Amino acid sequence: MSMIEEIYAREIFDSRGNPTVEVELYTESGAYGFARVPSGASTGVHEALELRDGEDRFGGKGVRKACSKVNEEIGPNLVGMDVTFQSAIDRALLELDGTDNKENLGANAMLGVSLAAARASAEFLGLPLYQVLGGVSSSTLPIPQMNILNGGEHADNNVDIQEFMIMPIRANNFQHAMRMGVEIFHALKNVLKDEGLSTSVGDEGGFAPDLKSNKEALEYIITAIEKVGYKPGEQVMLAIDAAASELYQGDKYHLEGEGKSLTADEMIDLYQDLVENYPIISIEDGLSEDDWEGWKKMTEKFQGKIQLVGDDLFVTNTDRLTRGIKEDIANSILIKLNQIGTVTETLEAIELAKKNGYTSVISHRSGETDDPFIADLAVATNAGQIKTGAPSRMDRVAKYNQLIRISEELYGVSRYPGMGSFYNLEV
């Protein structure tokens, strides 16, 4: 056994220069764990509450309150618990908070402790983090969804769709997938430069130029893929995140960059047009988080053909996912640790999805740190897909580098699933 001896939290900064929580956990055995908590820009209204100070400093975004919750409430209550009992630690956190949305302790405080405990457990047991989280069957390296062109809330430009991603589905292994993605990323930079467009990057490391339309973004990406000798639709597929909740106001979806206001039916028609003309295999948050009727129609339209990922729709919450399953809405869930606040609840959401034929996409947040925890989580759960930005900015690359290290550890036993990740599609 390895008993928790001390837990300490401090205020640090994320990739956007906003305060966030760092937690360090010490045990009597000497095993140590840490965590650096991410935060989102386009956040779902149903996410667990992130505790912020609301004072003048840092525009109200300070996290001293969250750190105090760790240092003065959580820590003293968890001292003496066995760090290898993750579910017991997370249950204690939930009981201590006592609310449905973590508004007492804050999901950022709770998650920091939960992640740090998992790491300390791995160190004590002398096992890789991914094996502690998932067991000896953890061996699948994920397809990266690389967000190489940014819009929406992730960029200061006129592009409405928030993320345009590439997926190297025909790579031989994870390292090969990284090579393909990196080569396409650099080719896209040259394509944009040749057109006299900006090559500055957005929150997630992708380029963020002003463009005439969302289709133009896809055209530039197709050009970049072909420039380095890969075949769109065969070796590389595309994915988009519309983050439609950010576009939704007054029963319409407002695409300001294109000067359009669309109904849910018209948004579905827009996606149909994109899917027919570009090799798009995955659409995330195509409609607003509470537009269940619209989501039902979209699922009926694309079921079995396109991966329909619920991010703001499901917020890594088993209650909302259960409703989606019962109503046959979407076919995939985006997994963000800080949407729910504990490792155990996150694993439960992934397991529920898997049992009901939904895929899981492990995801970062736009406000990231250099903590690569989600890389281990992706392998632990054999999710088959990870979304952690472009291959630029160390807050993104840290996750890719960790996956490279894991792939070396699992040499000879790991698998890169390719199209097998879309096991619920007719492809």
Curated annotation (Swiss-Prot):
Annotated binding of (2R)-2-phosphoglycerate, by residue: 162, 336, 365-366, 387
Catalytic activity: (2R)-2-phosphoglycerate = phosphoenolpyruvate + H2O
Cellular-component GO terms for this entry: cell surface; extracellular region; phosphopyruvate hydratase complex
UniProt entry keywords in alphabetical sequence: Cytoplasm, Glycolysis, Lyase, Magnesium, Metal-binding, Secreted
Coiled coil residues, start to end: none
Enzyme category, top tier: lyase
Compartments, record wording: Cytoplasm; Secreted; Cell surface
InterPro entries per record: Enolase, Enolase-like_C_sf, Enolase-like_N, Enolase_C, Enolase_CS, Enolase_N
Residues holding Mg(2+): 241, 284, 311
Cofactor(s) listed in the protein's UniProt record: Mg(2+)
Single GO MF annotation: magnesium ion binding
Cofactor detail note: Binds a second Mg(2+) ion via substrate during catalysis.
Residues the record marks as active site: 204 (proton donor), 336 (proton acceptor)
EC numbers on record: 4.2.1.11
GO process annotations (BP): glycolytic process
HAMAP family: Enolase (MF_00318)
UniProt family annotation: Belongs to the enolase family.
Name of the protein in question: Enolase
Organism of this sequence: Natranaerobius thermophilus (strain ATCC BAA-1301 / DSM 18059 / JW/NM-WN-LF)
